[in-house]
Amino acid sequence: MTGPGPRRDEARLSAWVHGHVQGVGFRWWTRARALELGLTGFASNRPDGRVHVVAQGSREACEKLLELLRSGETPGSVDKVIADWAEPDATMTGFSER
């Protein structure tokens, strides 16, 4: 028997953040904002200079995090954010920097 599936108002955000976002505290800042919003997931540096952010929780909180990522008030400088949406992964806990 499996547990209940994700609630309808829950979502999983996958955001690819382009710009000068490595070595400037961007992942730490993202983690702090995600935890304030009650989200789980991770922020990971990629070899090409992007940061991959995966966050899940309420759709509203994920949308707020996406808005913050695009706000211009992050560490470093964000040129663009490409976002994709999916069903949440029930096994994800906490929010980590990778």
Curated annotation (Swiss-Prot):
Quote the catalytic activity from the record.
an acyl phosphate + H2O = a carboxylate + phosphate + H(+)
Q: Report keywords, A-Z.
A: Hydrolase
- Give the top-rank taxon of the lineage listed in the UniProt record for this protein: Bacteria
Q: Which residues form the active site?
A: 27, 45
Q: Which GO terms describe its molecular function?
A: acylphosphatase activity
Q: Where is the Acylphosphatase-like domain?
A: 12-98
Class of this enzyme: hydrolase
According to its UniProt record, the EC number is 3.6.1.7
A Pfam family that this protein carries is Acylphosphatase
NCBIfam families this protein is in? Answer: PRK14422.1 (NF010997)
Q: Which family does it belong to?
A: Belongs to the acylphosphatase family.
Q: What is this protein called?
A: Acylphosphatase
Organism field? Mycolicibacterium smegmatis (strain ATCC 700084 / mc(2)155) (Mycobacterium smegmatis)
Protein encoded by which gene: acyP
